[in-house]
Amino acid sequence: MPATRTNILATLGRVLIASLLALSAGAASAEDTVTLPLTIKDHRFEPAEVHAPAGKPIALQVKNLGATAAEFESTVLHVEKVVAAGAEALIHVRPLEPGRYKFFDDFHRATEGFLVVP
């Protein structure tokens, strides 16, 4: 019986250490997040092209200055978010490989922009 208790305690200790390491790794990646401001005004994204480094998590701080709601969407980034008139939204994007990623306002399809990762 004492050997079983020792094994259980050893396993719990390993799980605790692994959990703490996972939490500290998550905190480090949150600090690495690149936040990019993006405004929707008069059915246009400003700027129309935003740049982010490869391999880093991205947060797009989208502010809708328009009089109507906008739907920020990107099929290639797998994100979709309705932003009410006068409101802001924080849109998280996974770390990306170099490329040019299109996004658009699904309510006004001519409104489009690009996230460029050099």
Where are these regions (language model features)?
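Extracellular/periplasmic metallocenter environments
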Residues: D32-P37, V83-P118
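Short beta-strand/loop motifs in extracellular/secreted proteins, especially
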Residues: I58, T68-A70, G113
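Cleavable N-terminal signal peptides
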Residues: V15-S19, A28
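Asparagine-centered strand-capping/turn motif at beta-strand->loop junctions
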Residues: V62-N64
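N-terminal edge beta-strand
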Residues: D32-G55
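Beta-strand-rich interaction surfaces with strong enrichment in secreted/lumenal proteins
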Residues: A48-V50, H78-V82
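Bacterial N-terminal signal peptides that target proteins for export
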Residues: P2-L16
